[in-house]
Amino acid sequence: ISAAMASQIQSAAGLASNKVSRVAGSDRYATAAALAASFGTGTPTAYVALGTNFPDAMAGSAAAGFTGGPILLVQTDSVPAATSTELADLAPDELFVLGSTGVISDTVVNAISPFIAPDVPEP
């Protein structure tokens, strides 16, 4: 959004300028990754959704908000570099794929599986 629109939103919400942060990347995948980075390493739960269509991400946003986990974006048959990098940094205990195999392929699921934190046996 434009700076003017951000200012209008800030004003309408009654927020001070130090309470509003802009998160941006070179594309929607990098923007989602930049936002996810604010969650920090060891985030217990993360979600991935298709980046070219919003219904699955929107449907999963309630769960993400409840669990405090970020939603990262993927393509139908590939994982953007920004998403891979951030998943490696987050190392979530659980990773939920929002969407069917018709939306997010098994190739993508297999590619993101290694980013799930390994189980640590109890002593």
What are the language-model segments listed below?
Residues 1-123:
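Extracellular glycan-binding segments that recognize GlcNAc-based cell-wall polysaccharides
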